[in-house]
Amino acid sequence: LSSLVSKGYIFLLIKIFYRVLDFDSVISSHMVNILFAFGVVGMIMGSVAAIKEKNIRRMTAYSSVAQIGYIYMGIGLGTTAGVVAALFHIISHGAMKSLLFISISGLTEVSDGRSDYLSLRGAGLRNKVAGAAFTVGSLSMIGMPLLTGFISKYLFAAAATTAGSKMITAWVVLAISTVLNTMYFIDRKSV
C-alpha cells in the first residue's frame, strides 16, 4: 500500500504545475531545476543506502527513495516527455514495489520471520512463488528489458534527449543508478 500512497503528493505536484501554475511558468521560474537536482541526489543517495543495508525490507524501502528520485528527475527535465516518464514510473514502481514487499513477506515467512540476507539464503527454493515474484520485481527495478522498469528507464532516457543541458547528466545518472540498483538487488555476496 505504501508503494502507491507515497506518491499521492507527486500526482498533486504535477496537477498544481499543470493546472494551477502553468507548466511553462514553472519551467521559466527554474523550479524544475531544483526538482531535477533533488531527483539526481535521491537516486544516488537512496541507492547507496540500499547497498549498505543488511535487512531486505529496509533495503527495499531505501530503494523507494532512489525510485522517487527518478520521478523527480523526470519532472525536473522540464518537458512533457519527462512528466509522462515520471507518471509511467509511478505506476510501474507502485506495482513492482508492491510485488517485492508481498514476496518478501513470503520469503521471510519460510525463514522463521527473519529478514536479514543471511537468514534468507534458500528462501526462494522453500517458497518458489515468492522467490519467482521477488526475481521478477527485482529484475524490473533494475531495468531488465521487456519489464516495466526497463520501459520507465527508456522513457526517462528518451525524455532526456529533449531536455537540453540536462541530457548528459540524466543519462549518466540513469546509468549509475542502474548499476547501483543491480548491486543492491542482485549482488549480495558481501552482505
Segment roles from a protein language model:
Residues 191:
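Conserved small/polar residues in nucleotide/adenosyl-binding loops
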Residues 1-188:
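Hydrophobic transmembrane alpha-helices and their helix-loop junctions in integral membrane proteins
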